[in-house]
Swiss-Prot record:
Domain of life, source organism: Eukaryota
UniProt function note: Mediates visceral muscle contractile activity (myotropic activity).
UniProt keywords, alphabetically: Amidation, Neuropeptide, Secreted
Protein name per UniProt: Periviscerokinin-1
Length: 11
């Protein structure tokens, strides 16, 4: 889940 500030790439 990308909150904007924290970028978590889901692959």
């Amino acid at each position: 889940a990308s909150s904007g500030l924290i970028s978590m790439p889901r692959v």
